């Protein structure tokens, strides 16, 4: 058992860490994911990070790609203090050009752009970065290229359009590659990244959820102390449940969970959540039925952003009121608020591109901190979704809940397009239940990352028996993804869709037509609103 007094508050001080400096590439988060896949902890920070402000020393540094040109005014550049750390450095695409620019400025616009697959020709197989890597397909995505070899570097690999597709200065342990090893289109990309992290950086591959849980429990105990009380909102989803379970293991009944039933949940959801969290996991849970309040506030509202804000604001009011009723047996005041932040949320907030135009308002309990004067505790903020699931299984969270598809904070309010009424919710609930039921019967539930039925605000002509009908339309959506930052639509067999559509039209009153959404993310988001 880990002694709480011996555990640093920062995970990067516990595990060997590769630092990924993000220059704004759409692939930057994949670098972090790939490293963790072979149990090396990696953390992403913006390329503007001042090295002097780091409170920990990385085992190695990776400079990501980016949509800029190093020679243009206003382009981002890395803090040159990275070279004072004397750790291995790998530059990818823009990151390689940044290294070349710093070491001689030999970067210019290419004669032609190189996007897509290319054949990599390894010229120097003795390079430690390319151990086990041979001539193979790689993924290129660049318009600029090196036109001269930087001082102290040698050519390791070429492509038809890139005479400097890979370069190295092994004396200084600095490497540059023009292609993207983090994407699956680069056939031996994982081998290359593993060589860098484990062989060159000598990072320990001890980043496992088994090691994380002991460290995290001790970290929570150190942060919270022996007497402080913690509250947290739970939804029955894997993130909030695993977060609640960690708190239960760390501080026992000093953690108080609150479940707000807003009337926008899936079929029989509240009953299932209560049974799982109390009887199954022993969590101290309070359930609040606020259905009438939420549906009353949503009456007549059709704009999705307004719906989200109404739900978020009223959630805060209900949560605050219920939290005020909690009187810990210890006599202590509530000091901390549990929040289920995951690492993709962190990446989104620190990406070098910065906060972009608001696509959707995130439904969380951030507003509670200022209102309730609570300190935040986020036990899952270093984890990707798949890591949270693995952690849940280790901690004894029921398998069905661990692998349950995500459900949005605003619930069915953003799956009922247009005004939310009890009647519309009933249609959406029943259609969704049939869809998920058929997915489970087909043995596809675990193959699909998220699936749901959305009720559209349009009507369509149909025929039931000898009668003409004019009823609503259900849109089915199912996606595949590893991190929910990008997603592809799931390809069902036609027979499955035919059976599901038939059941929905015949069993759900008010539905005349069923469609299937075949849009990927991007350009679409997962949810319709």
UniProtKB/Swiss-Prot annotation:
Keyword ATP-binding attributed: yes
Location in or out of the cell: Cytoplasm, Cytosol
Protein's GO biological process: GMP biosynthetic process
Binding site for ATP: 235-241
One Gene Ontology term of the molecular function aspect: GMP synthase (glutamine-hydrolyzing) activity
EC number: 6.3.5.2
Cofactors (names): Mg(2+)
Catalytic activity, reaction form: XMP + L-glutamine + ATP + H2O = GMP + L-glutamate + AMP + diphosphate + 2 H(+)
One GO CC term on file: cytosol
Residues at the active site: 93, 180, 182
Main subcellular location of this protein, as a coarse class: cytoplasm
Domain Glutamine amidotransferase type-1: 17-206
Root EC class: ligase
Cysteines paired by S-S bonds: none
Sequence ranges assigned to domain GMPS ATP-PPase in this UniProt record: 207-404
Pathway it works in: Purine metabolism; GMP biosynthesis; GMP from XMP (L-Gln route): step 1/1
Keywords assigned by UniProt, alphabetized: ATP-binding, Cytoplasm, Glutamine amidotransferase, GMP biosynthesis, Ligase, Magnesium, Nucleotide-binding, Purine biosynthesis
Stored PROSITE patterns: GATASE_TYPE_1, GMPS_ATP_PPASE
Ligand binding (XMP): 308, 466, 521, 527
Record note on quaternary structure: Homodimer.
Function: Catalyzes the conversion of xanthine monophosphate (XMP) to GMP in the presence of glutamine and ATP through an adenyl-XMP intermediate.
PANTHER family tied to this protein: GMP SYNTHASE [GLUTAMINE-HYDROLYZING] (PTHR11922:SF2), GMP SYNTHASE-RELATED (PTHR11922)
Name of the featured protein: GMP synthase [glutamine-hydrolyzing]
